[in-house]
């Protein structure tokens, strides 16, 4: 397991980011994450494992869309189905939201592999992009 570090809201490791305790409970923090990741990819697919996480799904997707990027959403989907489907939409980044208690956001490249440490470090150190 490779621990990369933390920013205000997330701990970054192994192709995912996990919310720090007491953070990312509101939509504005999740939208900020969406604006941040929008600067690194062109087309996104975002999904969540159950309806408990839809507010985070919508907020991240909103942040991405604010920056003029395409985002496809999958509500209430299992990870294998999500990983199979998003490359068919030509998405170059997959965002999967899961977790009980803390939010875990798994990030995948266009080939269904977890994002590399270099990209995660860039996300961790980057600030939110400007809306289009």
Question: How should each PLM-predicted stretch be described?
Answer:
Residues 24, 94-102, 124-132:
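A short, terminal or domain-edge coil/loop segment
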Residues 42-111:
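Ferredoxin-reductase
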Residues 1-67:
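An N-terminal, well-structured beta->alpha segment
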Residues 28, 80, 118-121:
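Generic alpha-helical secondary structure signal
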Residues 110-132:
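Ser/Thr/Gly-rich flexible loops in soluble cytosolic domains mediating phosphotransfer, phosphorylation
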């Amino acid at each position: 397991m490779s621990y990369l570090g933390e920013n205000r809201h997330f701990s970054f490791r192994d192709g995912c980011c996990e919310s720090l305790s007491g953070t990312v409970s509101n939509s504005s923090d999740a939208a900020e994450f969406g604006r941040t990741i929008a600067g690194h990819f062109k087309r996104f697919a975002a999904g969540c494992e159950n309806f408990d996480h839809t507010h985070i799904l919508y907020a991240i997707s909103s942040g991405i869309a604010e920056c003029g990027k395409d985002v496809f959403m999958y509500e209430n989907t299992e990870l294998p189905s999500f990983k199979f489907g998003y490359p068919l939409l030509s998405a170059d980044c997959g965002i999967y939201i899961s977790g009980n208690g803390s939010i875990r956001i798994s990030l995948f490249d266009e080939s269904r592999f977890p994002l590399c440490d270099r990209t995660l470090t860039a996300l961790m150190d980057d600030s939110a992009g400007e809306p289009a």
